[in-house]
């Protein structure tokens, strides 16, 4: 056992003395040491309840003959960090999470790890750490929030955080009063858990099942459901079996597992952020995978779900309809069914054991919402290295669009123009210098897209950015444009009025300029000057790579 480095031999007497100070006895030193990586915090609704999850994990570890040690890492609530300086820190927190877990696990010689994430950057940060450390590991997330209930005119409707973001645009346009907004604000987030739609956090928690790193139910069992606590106890027990069998993350997260994750992703219509995060996990796992492969998967994999923001259903509905297992059951012809999982069974075996889909929340593969998956990576002279769009959330009339560019060099300037009524039907908003280096931190453009949707412009206006989008975004929103403006990508050459062509069906994103004209303009673009010159974001700017490779740090 790795923990023998701190337990065995006379030279480890000081180590044992310190461990005895924790309450351990001689018998404890014969057992595996398990690190419990908790991301509990009192400021994030998705993490406020994770102490209860951790206690259940400890019970499982103890019952199976191990010793659990809980430690914490950071967690950012993207909703609270949205639309101010805090959003610059959200994506960069992913690397901090991975690094802090690495430090704790290596410093204390754990034999295995149980990860307890829930929200957006915590899941991929922990997955990256698991691959980097490559010791037996298992994930159990905190679970999704229930949808809120809004009563209006004797009618009750299901609402969520995205409802509030879009309502701001409705208020700005005079379609909703501030009093009505307040009533919505009060009920949209009714308790603990990750925000209730197929937004980034829930996308990543669901994909963790498809990657093979979590037990069935991880992605969909609500945070307040007793089955979540039972799942946590089972995860604590299962880590002991993984240690016994010496099954490590890199045995599980292979190119086949990445294939399965993206297959599930496009079937669910998951967040575009998943592309960034799964590519980063693949990098840490040494699993070679390209953006072009995502398009090949999406071309042949049906879109089976219309979950918020793409449709009316929430994660609780997905859970009631069979959960991720039922989606995987429909996807079996497109999966790598022999891929291993932490359960000890293959992904195909788990799919076989799942209940049949209901053909409502989870459509049959023979009756999909679309024969093609929910994500697409667009290429062209505007995005030579790719740009990601959630096509399942794009209105049919915007799948192909041609319009004049409206250029903004920050989210704030674009937001001001939208609120001021300066964006017209047919326009293509371009928000640049918001990429990994340019932002820095690749902020989410949820406020601009929510305003457009709330104003009813999401079927008439497209938005292109080298920044990111929230999983709650809907509309013709192309993000992750690579190379970014700060790296002198073609997006930096655009000027107001340039005609932009979007063809999602054929994976194309281009501007009606010759290569010569683009290069001529780029030659006159000033050298990018970093916006932040101190602290962690200075380090981040100097070391982060392109969104096309997951915005990981330089090797």
From Swiss-Prot:
It comes from the Bacteria. It comes from Dehalococcoides mccartyi (strain CBDB1). The active site is at residue 470. Pathway: Amino-acid biosynthesis; L-isoleucine biosynthesis; L-isoleucine from 2-oxobutanoate: step 3/4; Amino-acid biosynthesis; L-valine biosynthesis; L-valine from pyruvate: step 3/4. GO terms for cellular component: cytosol. Functions in the biosynthesis of branched-chain amino acids. Catalyzes the dehydration of (2R,3R)-2,3-dihydroxy-3-methylpentanoate (2,3-dihydroxy-3-methylvalerate) into 2-oxo-3-methylpentanoate (2-oxo-3-methylvalerate) and of (2R)-2,3-dihydroxy-3-methylbutanoate (2,3-dihydroxyisovalerate) into 2-oxo-3-methylbutanoate (2-oxoisovalerate), the penultimate precursor to L-isoleucine and L-valine, respectively. Keywords: 2Fe-2S, Amino-acid biosynthesis, Branched-chain amino acid biosynthesis, Iron, Iron-sulfur, Lyase, Magnesium, Metal-binding. The gene is ilvD. This is Dihydroxy-acid dehydratase. Mg(2+) binds at residues 78, 120-121, 444.
């Amino acid at each position: 056992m790795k923990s023998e480095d701190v337990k065995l031999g006379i030279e480890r007497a000081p180590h044992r003395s310190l461990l005895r100070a924790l309450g351990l006895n001689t018998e404890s030193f014969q057992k595996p040491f398990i690190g419990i990586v908790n991301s509990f915090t009192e400021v994030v609704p998705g993490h406020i309840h994770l102490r209860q999850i951790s206690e259940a994990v400890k019970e499982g570890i103890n019952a199976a003959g191990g010793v659990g040690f809980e430690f914490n890492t950071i967690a950012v609530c993207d909703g609270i960090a949205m639309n101010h300086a805090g959003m610059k820190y959200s994506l960069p927190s992913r690397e901090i999470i991975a690094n802090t877990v690495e430090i704790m696990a290596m410093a204390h010689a754990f034999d295995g790890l149980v990860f307890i994430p829930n929200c957006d950057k915590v899941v991929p940060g922990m997955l990256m750490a698991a691959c980097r450390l490559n010791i037996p590991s298992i994930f159990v997330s905190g679970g999704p929030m229930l949808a809120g209930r809004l009563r209006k005119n004797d009618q009750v409707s299901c609402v969520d955080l995205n409802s509030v973001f879009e309502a701001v645009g409705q208020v700005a346009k005079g379609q909703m009063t501030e009093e009505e907004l307040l009533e919505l604000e009060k009920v949209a987030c009714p308790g603990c858990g990750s925000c209730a739609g197929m937004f980034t956090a829930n996308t990543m928690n669901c994909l963790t099942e498809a990657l093979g790193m979590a037990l069935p139910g991880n992605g969909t069992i609500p945070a307040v459901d007793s089955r979540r606590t039972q799942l946590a106890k089972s995860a604590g027990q299962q880590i002991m079996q993984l240690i016994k069998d010496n099954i490590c993350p890199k045995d599980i997260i292979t190119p086949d597992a990445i294939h399965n994750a993206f297959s599930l992703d496009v079937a669910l219509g998951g967040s575009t952020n998943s592309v960034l995060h799964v590519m980063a996990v693949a990098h840490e796992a040494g699993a070679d995978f390209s953006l072009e492969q995502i398009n090949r998967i999406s071309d042949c994999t049906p879109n089976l779900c219309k979950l918020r923001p793409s449709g009316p259903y929430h994660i609780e509905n997905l859970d009631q309809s069979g959960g991720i297992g039922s989606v995987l059951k429909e996807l079996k012809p497109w999966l790598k069914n022999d891929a291993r999982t932490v359960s000890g069974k293959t992904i195909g075996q788990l799919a076989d054991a799942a209940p049949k889909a209901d053909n409502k929340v989870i459509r049959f593969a023979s009756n999909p919402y679309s024969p093609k998956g929910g994500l697409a990576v667009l290429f062209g002279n505007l995005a030579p290295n790719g740009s990601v769009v959630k096509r399942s959330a794009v209105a049919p009339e915007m799948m192909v669009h041609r319009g004049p560019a409206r250029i903004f060099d920050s989210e704030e300037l674009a937001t001001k123009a939208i609120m001021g009524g300066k964006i017209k039907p047919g326009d293509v908003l371009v928000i640049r210098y918001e990429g990994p280096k340019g932002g820095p931190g690749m902020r989410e453009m949820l406020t601009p897209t929510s305003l457009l949707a709330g104003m009813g412009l999401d079927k008439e206006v497209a938005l292109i950015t080298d920044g990111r989008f929230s999983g709650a975004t809907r509309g013709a929103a192309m993000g992750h444009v690579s190379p970014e403006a700060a790296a002198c990508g073609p997006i930096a050459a655009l000027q107001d009025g340039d005609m932009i062509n979007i063809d999602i069906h054929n994976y194309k994103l281009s501007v009606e300029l010759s290569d010569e004209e683009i290069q001529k303009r780029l030659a006159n673009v000033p050298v990018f000057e970093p916006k932040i010159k101190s602290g962690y974001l200075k380090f981040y700017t100097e070391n982060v790579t392109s969104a096309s490779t997951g915005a990981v740090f330089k090797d």
